[in-house]
Amino acid sequence: FFAAVEMRDNPALRDIPIAIGGSRERRGVISTANYPARKFGVRSAMPTGMALKLCPHLTLLPGRFDAYKEASNHIREIFSRYTSRIEPLSLDEAYLDVTDSVHCHGSATLIAQEIRQTIFNELQLTASAGIAPVKFLAKIASDMNKPNGQFVITPADVPAFLQTLPLAKIPGVGKVSAAKLEAMGLRTCGDVQKCDLVTLLKRFGKFGRILWERSQGIDERDVNSERLRKSVGVERTMAEDIHHWSECEAIIERLYPELERRLAKVKPDLLIARQGVKLKFDDFQQTTQEHVWPRLNKADLIATARKTWDERRGGRGVRLVGLHVTLLDPQ
């Protein structure tokens, strides 16, 4: 989205690899990249130095968050012409419930098509869309025909679509979970449909139920137009437990750019109420520690993590490290 705004405002950038991010000299990271840059392997959260090695002729831009926010607000206003049931996820993504919409004869497919065309007509930006009977399938569908298309999963399509859908496509299934599922012989939603729910609950806890429900096409979450994102976080579960502070610090160094990128999508000025860290130990007990802080700050997060590591670990191995921020109350 950021790259699309830059290419719109400067057409000379359209056909060349560009990325939004910090400079190599300041050990910056890539926030996002356009499709020509992605062909070279440039990705979000990648160190700028690595991106420039992959793509030496990459054009690096510092980012104009006011312009991105302005475009996002305009897009949100277009959404509101079709429904009041809008659940924003970030500057460039939202769920819309058009069940009761009278536009386009009530056709969700035609509404999505018209919204995409309106966005292009009024902002000269392309958009992709996913149409489905439940939220998680709409999210998956939205990725099927990027960067400028849409994909429809009708209620009748759901059973066949799920049979071959890789579990890694389900929101919340990361590399570690996918590997554990693979070890159980579970690769697709069709595989999980044959699995006992009790087995999943024993192996994955509450997430086991979510996994089972999604594999059946069940997602009872409504589109919440009152939704206000209260926090942003990022975490990593290690393949093997760590036992040394230097390992933990290295993980935080890798997680921080991703936290910064996610926060920038919902709060471009990076202003926050609190920030903190989470450690989960080898006995699955976990601890969090946070305190008031006005702006995202890596040095403070590292100091907080070190204090937590020293005072609460008690010699246990650490299996997960997480960083999070609590957003300011707009009221």
Swiss-Prot record:
Q: Which cofactor does it need?
A: Mg(2+)
**Where does the chain bind Mg(2+)?**
92
Q: Where is this site: Substrate discrimination?
A: 2
What the entry lists under Pfam families is as follows:
IMS, IMS_C, IMS_HHH_1
**One Gene Ontology MF term:** damaged DNA binding
- Residue ranges of domain UmuC in the record: 1-174
Active site per the UniProt annotation: 93
Q: What is its EC number?
A: 2.7.7.7
Any Gene Ontology CC annotation: cytosol
Q: Which InterPro entries match?
A: DNA/RNA_pol_sf, DNA_pol_Y-fam_lit_finger_sf, DNA_pol_Y-fam_little_finger, DNA_polymerase-Y, DNApol_IV, IMS_HHH_1, Rev_trsase/Diguanyl_cyclase, UmuC
Alphabetically, which GO biological process terms does the record hold? DNA replication; error-prone translesion synthesis; SOS response
The main enzyme category here is transferase
Q: Which reaction does it catalyse?
A: DNA(n) + a 2'-deoxyribonucleoside 5'-triphosphate = DNA(n+1) + diphosphate
Paste the cofactor note: Binds 2 magnesium ions per subunit.
By sequence similarity, the record places it as follows:
Belongs to the DNA polymerase type-Y family.
Q: Which PANTHER family match?
A: DNA POLYMERASE KAPPA, DNA REPAIR POLYMERASE UMUC / TRANSFERASE FAMILY MEMBER
Query: Matching HAMAP family, A to Z?
Result: DNApol_IV
State the protein's name: DNA polymerase IV
Q: Which organism is it from?
A: Escherichia fergusonii
Taxonomic lineage: Bacteria, Pseudomonadati, Pseudomonadota, Gammaproteobacteria, Enterobacterales
